[in-house]
């Protein structure tokens, strides 16, 4: 019997209050790592009407004007006017930063393996910056090997920003959210059930001021200039049965930090797989790569994507866990949900053989401390909105599939042995 079900994921635009915070946090991280690649950073940001608070823990030799960084990022997002209750030049920016705890630093600077003289390997030098669990996922539903609901939600959110920035829909404002519901049959996406877009906008569009007429115009414009371009290169398409909802409250004029307070790290499902995969709970933005919440989650995605790209599974989830101050993972798990072409235990052995999963190894393999400097001071802030994974618009080291051929060949050899 065919099993039919619906699955939904959401995304948000760069002007969403929580995403403003994520982007400021990662802009700070980019600047500090550009000047001092060994910086230890945990930058948290809060925004509200007229206020930006930058807090957390930072240990660095870099000398950077964080207030200017925050204002420039806010202006880049699009909050430049004074009529929104939140603007780059009229908000108050407060800074309350401490240094990284020496109790934490000693475990990161020298991992337990070297403190106890149990290993002199180079990658055993740095301990994990915290305990925790991290997940990575890949599947063959979308070209970028991501689940289709989050892939489409991100595409819609990015296109919302495109038509705002280029002036096609100049009445749009920065805040917005998207949501896509996909119908599945026996685990395969078969239809677009619902598309939801909530976008901040001016109260009037030209000479149109009636609320209902404004919403009708927005809905028509979004279908033509946001939805249709997003689906132009996809096999799956919205049809006559697809519900299209736009600003269901009836209007969305008050938005951004004037409408809701924002906080770094509050959109972790948007940042990852849209709820399609499990999540360890750790946020990414504002954290330097010694924090395994970030670097190990990138490594998990890298492993899972290479397994799927190799054709060894249709779906793959990888879990890592760490102990603070210890270099080697406490556990590694590979799960293919019955779609694997070889046993999960075989894949696990291949992962242990071909992927470096100690923090120092992950940092070196992905060049995570130096990429901001090599890319003109802009690296982490580029993934702080519209997802950290499946970003074909960016050159991200954890999205490479350079190990797929090796995995495929060695997995095939095990089946022939």
Swiss-Prot record:
The gene is metK. Mg(2+) binds at residue 18. This is S-adenosylmethionine synthase. It is an enzyme of class 2 (transferase). K(+) binds at residue 44. L-methionine binds at residues 57, 100, 260, 291. GO terms for biological process: one-carbon metabolic process; S-adenosylmethionine biosynthetic process. CDD domains: S-AdoMet_synt. Its main location: cytoplasm. One of its GO terms (molecular function) is methionine adenosyltransferase activity. It comes from Synechococcus elongatus (strain ATCC 33912 / PCC 7942 / FACHB-805). Its cofactor is Mg(2+); K(+). It catalyses: L-methionine + ATP + H2O = S-adenosyl-L-methionine + phosphate + diphosphate. It is found in: Cytoplasm. HAMAP family: S_AdoMet_synth1. Catalyzes the formation of S-adenosylmethionine (AdoMet) from methionine and ATP. The overall synthetic reaction is composed of two sequential steps, AdoMet formation and the subsequent tripolyphosphate hydrolysis which occurs prior to release of AdoMet from the enzyme. GO terms for cellular component: cytoplasm. Keywords: ATP-binding, Cytoplasm, Magnesium, Metal-binding, Nucleotide-binding, One-carbon metabolism, Potassium, Transferase. Binds 2 divalent ions per subunit. Pathway: Amino-acid biosynthesis; S-adenosyl-L-methionine biosynthesis; S-adenosyl-L-methionine from L-methionine: step 1/1. It comes from the Bacteria. ATP binds at residues 16, 175-177, 251-252, 260, 266-267, 283, 287. Belongs to the AdoMet synthase family. Pfam families: S-AdoMet_synt_C (PF02773), S-AdoMet_synt_M (PF02772), S-AdoMet_synt_N (PF00438). Homotetramer; dimer of dimers. Its EC number is 2.5.1.6.
């Amino acid at each position: 019997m065919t099993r039919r079900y619906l699955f939904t994921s959401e995304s948000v635009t760069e002007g969403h209050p929580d995403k403003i915070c994520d982007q400021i946090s990662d802009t700070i991280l980019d600047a500090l790592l550009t000047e001092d690649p060994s910086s230890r950073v945990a930058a948290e940001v809060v925004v509200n009407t007229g206020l930006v608070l930058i807090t957390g823990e930072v240990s660095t030799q870099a000398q950077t004007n964080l207030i200017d960084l925050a204002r420039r990022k806010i202006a880049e997002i699009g909050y430049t006017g004074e009529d929104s209750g939140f603007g780059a030049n009229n908000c108050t920016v407060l800074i309350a930063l401490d240094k990284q705890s020496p109790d934490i630093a000693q475990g990161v600077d020298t991992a337990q393996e070297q403190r106890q003289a149990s290993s002199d390997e180079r990658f055993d030098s740095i301990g994990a910056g915290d305990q925790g669990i991290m997940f990575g996922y890949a599947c063959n539903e979308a070209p970028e090997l991501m689940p289709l609901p989050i892939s489409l939600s991100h595409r819609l959110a990015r296109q919302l920003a495109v038509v705002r920035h280029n002036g096609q829909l100049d009445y749009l404002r920065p805040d917005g959210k998207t949501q896509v519901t996909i119908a599945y049959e026996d685990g395969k996406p078969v239809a677009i059930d619902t598309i939801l877009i909530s976008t901040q906008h001016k109260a009037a569009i030209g000479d149109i001021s009636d609320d209902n007429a404004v919403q009708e115009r927005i809905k028509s414009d979004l279908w033509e200039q946001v939805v249709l371009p997003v689906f132009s290169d996809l096999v799956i398409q919205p049809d006559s049965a697809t519900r299209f909802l736009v600003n269901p409250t009836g209007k969305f004029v008050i938005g951004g930090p004037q409408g809701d307070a924002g906080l770094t790290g509050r959109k972790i499902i948007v940042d990852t797989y849209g709820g399609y995969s499990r999540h360890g709970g750790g946020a990414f933005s504002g954290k330097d790569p010694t924090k395994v919440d970030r670097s190990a989650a990138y490594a998990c995605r890298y492993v899972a994507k290479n397994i799927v790209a190799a054709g060894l599974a249709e779906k793959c989830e990888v879990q890592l866990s760490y102990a603070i101050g210890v270099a080697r993972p406490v556990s590694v798990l590979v799960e293919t949900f019955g779609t694997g072409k070889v046993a999960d235990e075989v894949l696990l052995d291949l992962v242990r053989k071909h992927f470096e999963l100690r923090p120092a190894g992950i940092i070196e393999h992905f060049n995570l401390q130096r990429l901001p400097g090599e890319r003109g001071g802009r690296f982490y802030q580029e993934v702080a909105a519209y997802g950290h994974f499946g970003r074909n618009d960016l050159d991200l080291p954890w999205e490479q599939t350079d190990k797929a051929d090796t995995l495929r060949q060695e997995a095939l050899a095990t089946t022939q042995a």
